[in-house]
């Protein structure tokens, strides 16, 4: 009985998988419209450089090729997010398409130019980006011609590097781009075009965040907390440390924010510095309050030992509070990034 039950479950599982595969294949076939010609498209990225976050753009040098069957020529394309077209270069592989042994037409081109990408900097300096290159056909709408990826994996030069960034791989996809306008041409309706997109995933290395941004700030925080280990009677020395720490934190914030474009929101690092400013100001206020208490009661017996113990406890609580808040901000940033992927 048990063996018969397992065989029945296995049969149901196999039937389910076959049904899902058939449904997926039917859905893919249903996406092709009557009279629509398919162009299999691939990209081989050679170089990507001059990544300019302030201008939201980058330069790319790559090959793009097309394989198709039919009379419609897919070579007359527009790079939708191309900018500075006066410096754009385009060199075709062949003057006329080649006939491949499998019956496909083949041609391509080498492209070099600047492309636009809106950088989302909410998670700076742990930000990740998908740099995209978008193409559409100028002559034919989606119901006549559709671009599809030539293979499951996009191609990138083997020794491809981007200094200051980690490369997370590349993808190609095809989607519909609907223009909800007739561009002023009477009698025409909104038009949809096949939009082919190449995406390169990049991310800043964690070492940039830890060593260049967090380490200097952590040193400033620890130096400011050192004021709570100085004798309560030495008010000038106790105040000078957090004041110096506050000025240093302001200068450190300016050093990285000057390299970012003007955005209307706080990036992750701004939020970390906001926590730092609050902690340093709290240290300074604590030093002032304790100093005033000692000055007022200097003619009386003041339990300085108790004050020093309280200050040291506050120092440890302060560093713990800072670490917990930073970890909370990092967790919120990670959840936000995961929601956008």
Report the location of each language-model feature:
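Acidic, carboxylate-rich catalytic segments that either coordinate divalent cations
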Residues: 307, 323, 338-340
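Flexible extramembrane loops and terminal tails that flank transmembrane helices
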Residues: 177-178, 307, 315, 329-332
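Hydrophobic core of alpha-helical transmembrane segments in multi-pass integral membrane proteins
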Residues: 16, 319-331
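Bacterial N-terminal signal peptides
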Residues: 10-20
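Juxtamembrane boundary at the C-terminal end of a transmembrane helix
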Residues: 328-341
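Soluble non-transmembrane domains of integral membrane proteins
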Residues: 25-201
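Bacterial N-terminal signal peptides that target proteins for export
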Residues: 1-10
């Amino acid at each position: 009985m048990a063996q018969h039950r397992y065989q029945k479950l296995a049969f149901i599982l196999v039937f389910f998988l076959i049904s899902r595969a058939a449904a997926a294949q039917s859905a893919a076939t249903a996406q092709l419209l009557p009279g629509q010609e398919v162009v299999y498209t691939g990209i081989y990225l050679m170089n990507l450089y001059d990544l300019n976050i302030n201008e939201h753009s980058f330069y790319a040098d790559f090959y793009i090729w097309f394989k198709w069957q039919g009379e419609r020529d897919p070579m007359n394309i527009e790079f939708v997010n191309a900018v500075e077209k006066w410096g754009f270069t385009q060199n075709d592989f062949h003057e006329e398409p080649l006939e491949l042994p499998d019956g496909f037409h083949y041609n391509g081109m080498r492209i070099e130019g600047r492309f636009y990408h809106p950088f989302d900097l909410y998670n700076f300096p742990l930000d990740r980006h998908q740099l995209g290159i978008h193409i559409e056909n100028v002559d034919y709408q989606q119901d006549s011609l559709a671009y599809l990826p030539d293979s499951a994996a996009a191609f990138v030069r083997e020794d491809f590097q981007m200094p200051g960034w980690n490369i997370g791989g590349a993808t190609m996809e095809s989607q519909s781009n609907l223009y909800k306008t007739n561009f002023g041409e009477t009698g025409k309706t909104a038009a949809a075009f096949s939009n082919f997109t190449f995406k390169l995933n990049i991310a800043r290395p964690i070492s940039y965040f830890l060593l260049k941004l967090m380490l200097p700030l952590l040193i400033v925080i620890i130096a400011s907390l050192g004021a709570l280990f100085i004798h309560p009677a030495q008010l000038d020395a106790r105040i000078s440390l957090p004041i110096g720490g506050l000025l240093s934190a302001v200068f450190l914030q300016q050093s990285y924010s000057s390299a970012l474009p003007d955005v209307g929101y706080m990036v992750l690092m701004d939020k970390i510095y906001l926590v730092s400013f609050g902690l340093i100001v709290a240290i300074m206020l604590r030093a002032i309050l304790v100093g005033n208490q000692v000055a007022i009661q200097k003619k009386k017996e003041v339990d300085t030992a108790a004050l020093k113990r309280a200050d040291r406890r506050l120092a440890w609580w302060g560093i713990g509070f800072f670490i917990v808040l930073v970890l909370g901000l990092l967790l919120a940033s990670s959840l936000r990034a995961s929601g956008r992927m």
